[in-house]
Amino acid sequence: MNLSEIKAALLERNMFAPVAIPVACYLVYKLLRMGSREKTLPPGPPTKPVLGNLHQMPAMNDMHLQLSKWAQEYGGIYSLKIFFKNVVILTDSASVTGILDKLNAKTAERPTGFLPAPIKDDRFLPIALYKSDEFRINHKAFKLLISNDSIDRYAENIETETIVLMKELLAEPKEFFRHLVRTSMSSIVAIAYGERILTSSDPFIPYHEEYLHDFENMMGLRGVHFTALIPWLAKWLPDSLAGWRVMAQGIKDKQLGIFNDFLGRVEKRMEAGIFDGSHMQTILQKKEELGFKDRDLIAYHGGVMIDGGTDTLAMFTRVFVLMMTMHPECQQKIRDELKEVMGDEYDSRLPTYEDALKMKYFNCVIREVTRIWPPSPIVPPHYSTEDLEYDGYFIPKGTVIVMNLYGIQRDPKVFDAPDEFRPERYMESEFGTKPGVDLTGYRHTFTFGAGRRICPGLKMAEIFKRTVSLNIIWGFDIKPLPNSPKSMKDDVVVPGPVSMPKPFECEMVPRSQAVVQVIHEVADY
């Protein structure tokens, strides 16, 4: 290379220098700013460069506790930074209503990495993308569940399963944990598929519980929840650092196998000319009208009812029995109120959902059980698809939005002694809150989600909770044993995506011989 060529090369490099230097400086600046909270976001815990708040994030099973602790320090709406990602935590009713309910068109989406591949699938409604055809079809189909005729069938099916439960509790009172699972599962399967789980020894129960247990273990792994925040990073991690991947494939296979087995039996009954009016028969009859083109999508539609309802309903009734074990004085108050409602029929028939609706104190108990420990302490995350403003904050497009239900329902600024079981708080105010508390947006249905993601099984769940719980108290005196938990501080609940009480002991004694006779009469009818 001669001297002129060298000069030309240096000149060419110098031409790019004015551009390259600012670009390099900008990239360095962006890297250093990664993890820093923008001033327009809600406040939050201090961040570290690049990491943001990543170093402070606990395991999933403890997440609700840390999020609630931060809420007491930074307020009902605050933000976290995970690298470049924004996460907004909602821990008061006003922000949930203002962001997830009122701005639902902008916040109905799920993060694309909410669950790790291969579980994530738009055919599974809880995680389906809001703007997908799958979500639209499922949402339309679930509207068939909330018709007046459907609601009447819920009550009938649940009362039928409650009769079986009462007989099981007479025969095997110590096995109430298993019997409550059968009752919730059979109620849902009957409504969805026209089938019943007749005994607590049915092999489907442990198979389904094993699959859900695997799912909860996977979701409890440290790091798995970052797939919602940094899906591209999770994709490239080796299996040694992403142990949930292998677990996810096994879970997906079991899940779809269960759903297709149930759907196949419905199809066979229809081919044989047997029509039972179940929800899935209605779906198959109207699948073209509803837009179902994929058989797996139909299978998932029914399956989400099993997965979404069995554990949550069983969890509620187990917590109810636990609270009655810890607070036996509540039982007699419920019976006294029920006696007034049923009158002369008190010892001659089982109570119904209609009876439950007339009972003020009993409904306070139901609400307090729901408040003291919700089935899912943290609601599955939402995702903003547009920029939005709330209460002076700017929340940019692409923000993960988390509703901390545990923190909302255990907020000491809202509830007196929030960790104590006090049904009477609902006798004093509609939502059991302290006098003078701002109740903007408060409602009894936070446990079912918010916005356009609210659970379509809300009505069925309310019927189930009241019918099953009231019958248990009508029929049995629940007595603590020496090893029974004494309070919620006794570490009685296993945390996780669905927080089940740990197995505990109590004694269930029939209230009278008349009760035993009534149960046998209706069970043998």
Curated annotation (Swiss-Prot):
A molecular-function term among this protein's GO annotations: monooxygenase activity
Report the EC number(s), separated by commas if there are several. 1.-.-.-
* Key words of the record: Glycoprotein, Heme, Iron, Membrane, Metal-binding, Monooxygenase, Oxidoreductase, Transmembrane, Transmembrane helix
Q: Binding positions for heme?
A: C455
Q: Name one Pfam family in it.
A: p450
Supply the enzyme class, top level.
oxidoreductase
Per the record, membrane topology reads: Single-pass membrane protein
Protein name (Swiss-Prot/TrEMBL)? Cytochrome P450 monooxygenase ple6
Organism (species)? Rhodocybe pseudopiperita
Q: Which gene encodes it?
A: ple6
